[in-house]
Design a protein with these regions (language model features):
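AAA+ P-loop NTPase nucleotide-binding core of proteostasis motors
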Residues: 1-409
Length: 409
C-alpha cells in the first residue's frame, strides 16, 4: 500500500489520491492472478502429459484413471493457491511501468543513488564533454530532487556549439539513463518548421485543414509518453513563432493542442540544440583548442530573445574536440564494428594504431560524424569487399596497416 501511494504520487501527478493508488493495487493484483493462473495451468499440463504418456506406453489403464482423478483434485486446489498470493511492491511497479513506459526495475531503484551516479554514467558514453555533462546532469538532478517548481518541466536546456561534438549523443544517453529506453527520446528537426504555416504542425492542424485528425507532432508524442526527453534539434532554423510555443512549455509546463487537449510537459526534459557560435573557429569544423564559451554566449544572446533565455534552466556550451577525444571516439566506433562482426559469427582483430590514425584524420576533416564516415570509407568498405571475395566464411579476420593503407586477411 505504501509503495502504491509513493509511486502514484511520483509518476501519476495528473490523477488524484486515493483513486490512483487503488487503481495501481487493482492492476497489480490482476497481473499477479494472470501470471499465477498461467503458471499453474502450465504445471498441470506438463504433469498430465508426462504421466499419461507413461501410463499409455505401459498399458496401465487403471493408473491413467487415477491420473485423471488427480487432475481434477489439483484443478480444485488452484483457486486456493491463487487466493494465497499477495501483491508486492514489484507488482505495483509493473503497473506503473505499463502506464508511463518506464521499466519497472527503475521505478523501484533508489532514485538518490541513480541521480548521484548520473554524471559518471553519462560521461562514460559522451566523450570529451565533461563540463557540459556536469552542467546538464546538475540541472536534471535539481529538477528530479523534488524541490523544483511542479508547474515546469524537469529541466529546460539549450545546448550550443559546433556540429559533431556530442549534443545529440548526450540527449540519447540521458534519455536512456532517465527513462530506461532510447525510444523515450522524442526528436524533432526544426528544419521542418522553417515556414510560418508549418509551425501549427507542432500542436496540430486547425479544424478544416489536412491532418487535423492526426494531432500535433510534438503534443501527440508527449501526450502518449509524458515521461520523455524532448529534443528540438537546430532550433535557430525554426520560424520565430516556435519560440512562443516554447515559452508556454518552459513557464507553465502545459500546452493545448488543436483538439483542445492539455498536454502535460511537467515530467519531461526539454532540450534544444543550436549551432549558434559554431562559426567561431580557426581550425577544421568542430575543433579548436581555445575556449570560446564567452563568444558563443554572446552569439546566443544576439540570436535568441531575452524572455526565451530567461526561462531556460541552463545554457550549455560544448567545447571543440581535440586529438585525444577523437582517438577515444574512434576506439568506440571500432568496438561497435567488432561487435557487429562478432554477431555474424566472426572475430575481427584490429591494430591499436588504427584508432590513432583515424582520430588524426578525423580531426583534420571534421567532427565525430565525419569520423564515422572516415571509418566507413577506410575500414568498413574494404572489410565488406574482403568478405565478398572469401569463398568460405572466415572465423577470424586480421587487419594490417602499411603506409596508412588498411588490408584484411
Amino acid at each position: 500500500m505504501t509503495e502504491a501511494i509513493r509511486l502514484s504520487v511520483r509518476y501519476l501527478p495528473d490523477l488524484y489520491l486515493p483513486d490512483k493508488a487503488i487503481d495501481l493495487l487493482d492492476e497489480g493484483a490482476s497481473h499477479v492472478r494472470m501470471e499465477e493462473t498461467f503458471a499453474l495451468r502450465q504445471n498441470v499440463q506438463a504433469f498430465l502429459e508426462q504421466e499419461l504418456t507413461d501410463a499409455v506406453k505401459t498399458s496401465q489403464f487403471e493408473k491413467a484413471a487415477e491420473i485423471r482423478d488427480k487432475m481434477q483434485k489439483m484443478a480444485a486446489r488452484f483457486p486456493d493457491a491463487r487466493k494465497s498470493k499477495t501483491v508486492t511492491a514489484s507488482d505495483v511497479a509493473w503497473a506503473v511501468s505499463v502506464r508511463t513506459g518506464i521499466p519497472a526495475g527503475r521505478l523501484s531503484e533508489d532514485m538518490r543513488t541513480r541521480l548521484l551516479n548520473l554524471e559518471k554514467t553519462v560521461s562514460g558514453q559522451v566523450i570529451g564533454q565533461d563540463a557540459a555533462v556536469q552542467t546538464v546532469c546538475r540541472a536534471v538532478r535539481t529538477g528530479l530532487s523534488g524541490i523544483r517548481d511542479e508547474n515546469r518541466p524537469v529541466a529546460s536546456l539549450l545546448l550550443t556549439g559546433p556540429t559533431g561534438v556530442g549534443k545529440t549523443e548526450l540527449c540519447r544517453v540521458l534519455a536512456k539513463e532517465l527513462y530506461g529506453k532510447e525510444d523515450a527520446l522524442i526528436r524533432l528537426d526544426m528544419t521542418e518548421f522553417m515556414e510560418k504555416h508549418s509551425v501549427a504542425r507542432l500542436i496540430g492542424a486547425p479544424p478544416g485543414y489536412v491532418g487535423y485528425e492526426e494531432g500535433g507532432k510534438l503534443t501527440e508524442a508527449v501526450r502518449r509518453r509524458p515521461y520523455c526527453l524532448v529534443l528540438l534539434d537546430e532550433l535557430e532554423k525554426a520560424h520565430p513563432d516556435v519560440a512562443g510555443i516554447l515559452l508556454q512549455i518552459m513557464e507553465e509546463g502545459v500546452l493545448t493542442d488543436s483538439a483542445g487537449r492539455r498536454v502535460n510537459f511537467k515530467n519531461a526534459v526539454v532540450v534544444m540544440t543550436s549551432n549558434v557560435g559554431g562559426e567561431l573557429k580557426t581550425e577544421g569544423l568542430g575543433f579548436q583548442p581555445l575556449d570560446h564559451s564567452d563568444r558563443v554566449m554572446e552569439s546566443v544572446r544576439q540570436r535568441f530573445q531575452p524572455e526565451f533565455l530567461g526561462r531556460l534552466d541552463a545554457v550549455v556550451c560544448f567545447k571543440r574536440l581535440d586529438s585525444s577525444d577523437m582517438e577515444r571516439i574512434a576506439e568506440k566506433y571500432l568496438e561497435q564494428l567488432k561487435s557487429r562482426v562478432q554477431a555474424n559469427g566472426m572475430q575481427l582483430n584490429l591494430p591499436e594504431k588504427l584508432a590513432v590514425s583515424l582520430g588524426a584524420e578525423g580531426k583534420n576533416r571534421g567532427g565525430a560524424r565525419s569520423l564515422r564516415r572516415i571509418i566507413q570509407e577506410r575500414v568498413e568498405t574494404p572489410l565488406a569487399a574482403f568478405l565478398l571475395t572469401c569463398s568460405k566464411k572466415p572465423s577470424k579476420i586480421r587487419c594490417s596497416m602499411e603506409n596508412e593503407e588498411i588490408r584484411f586477411f
